[in-house]
A protein has these predicted regions:
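Radical SAM enzyme core and accessory elements
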Residues: 2-8, 28, 44, 48, ...
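Radical SAM [4Fe-4S] cluster-binding motif and immediate context
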Residues: 162-316
Length: 584
């Protein structure tokens, strides 16, 4: 007997915690369970071939918005090849409107609804032991063979989180991939767009068990552990125990990612966070909107000014990589109010500002009230908003331009200095990205692959069309040069940069003995990292200053080179120092 669990991930570096939990919990049937993990970048035919070669006796699929189209095609095609093999599905994408799903997919034997660990174990017993009946298994829906009607069994009782065995014993199978870890399940909040709000029974894994498992990850030096807890810090003592543990057992390599509610953080937690190694943890903070009417309508609990204050306090330690999230397309959010939300959160200058679009998920409050809000969304996954009562499709398209420009020029971290010096030249940050997006659209640059240096050239083209003064363009040329060398020692020198022959003495003096470094002259002192925003552009200096980019000592948060201003060196000094070692 072979029961085959199929996971189709969004990226290779992802792993599917759900299928590993299912196998771990069904411990009496380990030998009969196999897992096949693929990605949406694999051809459907390739996945189909692999499943067929595995020759499963029972085929199961883990279903999410990013893979549902693939799953539906695989179900259809595999059933043609092996109609005798039962096909079961589970996951958030099939746990709602189950009867409709089964009616539309006659190839599917049944659906595992909600939490699947105990249900899957019982299903394994049913097939392996060839005993009992499906209607004795809680948490499933299946088609009655005689009447064709959908049969729903009793729902499963909520899982005790500590009963789920650790699923990463064979950690070598997850090399170069993100480890997903769950220390709690459920959410205390009631956000209308989110499925986590439906599970009101908040449960936590035993803290000593959590510590033991985190110690395993730390010992194995895995690169990243991403907690999937919906609001990690909703219980203060639980969060403190885990943060204290990872701090005390830090191996200098492993990074931990947490999704938190910033306005729940207290001074004790902030003090602990500030004392951590730079890069030890990442924090993802959902804001979604700053429009008070929108926040109330989506049932979100958030004290905005407190959140901003906490975000600034986190940043003051200069040791935490911080993501802030916004959602376009929420009720009562029009183009103008979204632009305001964007500018308010962009002003905080997080390491990344994730701009997403509303997904109308089956089972959510938003799904039930979509008609009331006049939300039009895609019929296919991921059910992304197209327009609402407040936001036209034209507006959505404009915001999508902003999103792409934000990803390329801000979230990439590759144009940090240039974004800072450009912002004062526009009415707002949102306007800057919007106008840049319009420029890309007019020039046909969207949809094309551009090198990093080409992205810089396009920025200069854009600013020339803005009829910027020569002084501004000179400054931008230098800021772009700074940004290009900030990340790496460029193989191709930008065309606008001065010839290296003009400062060869500095290069010979400061970049010796094979040390990975670069020296460059600038006529501007550009803002340091701690300077989040500028009120005016920098003043041009009469004489250049020389900046040394050290690629062997990078910032642990954004991996930019360490940069220091160094003294100008004359040819006589350079000659005098010949043969002597110089630290870079």
């Amino acid at each position: 007997m072979k029961i085959f669990l199929t996971a189709i991930n969004a990226k290779y570096i992802h792993s599917n915690l759900a299928v590993y939990n299912l196998r771990a919990y069904a411990k009496d049937y380990q030998e009969q369970i196999a897992i096949g993990e693929y990605t949406i970048n694999n051809r459907v035919d390739y996945i189909l071939e692999q499943i067929y070669k595995a020759k499963p006796d029972v085929l199961c699929f883990s279903c999410y918005i990013w893979n549902m189209d693939y799953v539906e095609e695989l179900i259809t095609e595999y059933h043609k090849l092996c109609p005798e093999v039962p096909i079961w599905v589970g996951g958030p994408e099939v746990s709602y409107e189950v009867e409709t799903f089964l009616a539309e997919h006659p190839q599917v034997t049944g659906v595992m609804i909600g939490e699947g660990e105990r249900t899957f174990e019982q299903l394994c017993g049913y097939y392996v032991n060839q005993a009992g009946s499906l209607d004795e298994i809680r948490g499933i829906a299946f088609r009655n063979q005689d009447s064709g009607k959908t049969v729903f069994t009793l729902p499963q009782e909520p899982m005790n989180m500590s009963d789920i065995p650790f699923c990463y014993d064979h950690i070598e199978n997850f090399e170069n991939r993100i480890i997903y870890y769950e220390s709690s399940r459920g959410c205390p909040f009631n956000c209308s767009y989110c499925l986590s709000s439906i599970d009101k029974k908040l449960r936590f894994r035993d803290i000593e068990l959590v510590k033991k498992e985190l110690a395993f990850f730390i010992e194995k030096k895995v690169p990243q552990v991403k907690f999937v807890d919906r609001t990690f810090n909703c219980r203060h003592d639980h969060a403190m125990e885990i943060w204290r543990f990872v701090k005390e057992h830090d191996n200098g390599i492993t990074n931990f990612h947490f999704e938190i509610s910033a306005d729940l953080l207290n001074e004790e937690e902030l003090a602990l966070i500030h004392d951590m190694r730079p890069g030890l943890i990442q924090l993802e903070i959902g804001v979604q909107s700053t429009n008070e009417t929108t926040i109330r309508e989506i049932h979100r609990t958030m004290k905005l000014e407190l959140l901003k204050d906490i975000v600034r306090k986190i940043q003051s330690g200069e040791n935490i990589h911080e993501h802030l999230d916004l959602i376009a397309g929420l009720p009562y959010e029009d183009y103008a109010t979204f632009a305001k939300s964007f500018d308010e959160i962009y002003a905080l200058k997080p390491n990344q500002l994730q701009l997403g679009f509303l997904k109308v998920l089956k089972g959510s409050y938003m799904y039930e009230h979509a008609a009331e809000y006049e939300i039009v969304y895609h019929a296919k996954t991921p059910y992304e908003v197209m327009k609402t009562k407040w936001l036209s499709f034209d507006d959505v398209l404009k915001i999508k331009q902003v999103e792409e420009m934000l990803e390329v020029y801000y979230n990439s971290g590759q144009f940090e200095i240039t974004m800072k010096v450009m912002e004062p030249l526009f009415d707002s940050a949102f306007a800057m990205f919007q106008e840049l997006g319009v420029f890309y659209e007019e020039k046909g640059y969207f949809g094309m692959s551009h090198s990093r240096i080409r992205r810089a050239e396009i920025l200069l083209e854009f600013m020339r069309e803005q009829k910027s003064e020569d002084a501004v363009l000179q400054m931008l040329e230098e800021s772009l040069t700074f940004d290009l060398y900030y990340r790496e020692n460029c193989k191709s020198r930008p065309l606008w940069a001065p010839s290296p022959a003009e400062f060869k003495e500095q290069t010979r003096y400061y970049c010796k003995n094979g040390v990975k470094s670069h020296v460059e002259p600038f006529h501007y002192r550009f803002p340091e990292k701690s300077k989040k925003a500028l009120n005016e552009i920098p003043t041009r200096l009469k004489q250049p200053v020389y900046m040394l980019f050290d690629y062997e000592n990078r910032d642990p948060l954004d991996h930019q080179a360490h940069v220091t201003e160094v003294a100008a060196v004359s040819m006589a000094e350079e000659t005098k120092s010949a043969g002597k070692a110089k630290l870079c």
